[in-house]
Amino acid sequence: MAHKRLFVYAVLLVICYLVGVTWAETAAQTFPAIGTNSNNNSNAQPAPVPAPAAPAAAAPLAKQVSAPTAAPPAKVIGQPVLAAPGKNSSNSSSTTECVCAGALLPRLDANGKELPICAECKCSHVARNTTLIKVVVIIVIWIISILVIYMLFLMCLDPLLNKRVKANYQEHTNEDDEPTPPLPAVNNQELSARANVLNRVGHQQDKWKRQVREQRRHIYDRHTMLN
């Protein structure tokens, strides 16, 4: 019985630990701390971009702008706004998102056409909430400690209960071998008054025991004869 309890408590401890760790991980991922970096040109109007030069002069500029830069640590997402004032208004109100890979510089494609510029960019930094993880870990440790203390208490209490049960338990033996319980001490008058009754009861018990022995002997003899 004690081994079964230990196994059940061990399984409960493992389940509590796994549930606590997974819940902490999911909570840290679903509740990230978002920090925003304000841009200097967020509230100001976008500066006019000079008209594109000749294709020959635009080629080195396009190469210079499209050169690979170091990847920023955060993902910057904004709405594209065309800087050229002469463009169609339908293009400037586009709701497609672009990714700002670096500084807000005018970019040109291979054909010398201007690319949309992200006027307002917000950087979202995803970080784990360490406070929540600490709280969850502390709760899990408390639960495990309580279960361990309860398990040790039951382990210490189990031998005492077993001793008490063994002390109260009396093995059932054959009725023929059972000694007659000692009669409590009574007065001589009561003994003399009950002497006849006790003798009669004793004779009846002896007679009944003899009958039981004979019946058992006959049954055993018949059983051996049948075998």
UniProtKB/Swiss-Prot annotation:
Family indicated by similarity: Belongs to the TMEM9 family.
Major location (coarse): membrane
Originating organism: Drosophila melanogaster (Fruit fly)
InterPro entries given in the database record: TMEM9/TMEM9B (IPR008853)
Name this polypeptide is given: Uncharacterized protein CG1161
Topology term for the membrane: Multi-pass membrane protein
Keyword Protein biosynthesis: no
UniProt keyword terms in alphabetical order: Membrane, Transmembrane, Transmembrane helix
Top-level division of the source organism's lineage: Eukaryota
A Gene Ontology cellular-component term: lysosomal membrane
Localisation per UniProt entry: Membrane
TM ranges: 7-24, 135-157
Chain segments annotated as coiled-coil in the UniProt record: none
PANTHER family per record: TRANSMEMBRANE PROTEIN 9, TRANSMEMBRANE PROTEIN 9 FAMILY MEMBER
